[in-house]
Design a protein with these regions (language model features):
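Conserved Rossmann-fold SDR core element
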Residues: 54, 64-79, 114-122
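Hydrophobic positions on the long internal alpha-helix
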Residues: 7, 11-15, 19, 56-57, ...
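Short glycine-enriched, charge-decorated loop/helix-capping segments at active-site entrances
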Residues: 41-44, 87-93
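Catalytic loop of short-chain dehydrogenase/reductase
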Residues: 24-52, 57-58, 62-66, 78
Length: 127
């Protein structure tokens, strides 16, 4: 929880005074943090932390909607990373880290016009 929840909360708290009308905070979560999604053994701490980040972002969206600061969450599915390789040896994810980074970058710049307080599941496969 130290990195996946508490660090996100602390960084967000520190940045709030610098955010202006129209700002967009995008938090990265995981499909494992989505209630009702497929769960995998050995990922209890990770998945529950990602669920906590989802709830945090939903609450912040409500708290800062009057200031027109958007908070959204991208719950990522399988992306080819070292962590995925360790958790699922031999599995080939359909997306590279670079492809996902491009998606996150573009979402961050424009999606506050369309979303606030939303959790978007970004997955073309399982896990």
């Amino acid at each position: 929880y130290k990195v996946n929840v508490f660090a996100v909360a602390e960084i967000t708290k520190l940045m709030i005074p610098f955010l202006q009308k129209g700002s967009h905070v995008v938090t990265i979560s995981s499909m494992g943090g989505i209630q009702g999604s497929m769960k995998f053994p050995g990922l209890a701490a990770y998945s529950s932390a990602k669920g906590a980040v989802i709830t945090l972002s939903e609450l912040l969206a409500e708290e800062y909607k009057e200031q027109q600061i958007a908070f959204n969450v991208l719950a990522l599915g399988a992306v080819q990373t070292e962590m995925l390789e360790e958790a699922f040896p031999g599995y080939e994810a359909p997306l590279s880290a670079v492809e996902m980074a491009d998606y996150i970058y573009n979402f961050s710049l424009t999606s506050n016009k369309f979303y606030n307080g939303k959790v978007l599941q970004v997955s073309s496969s399982t896990p």
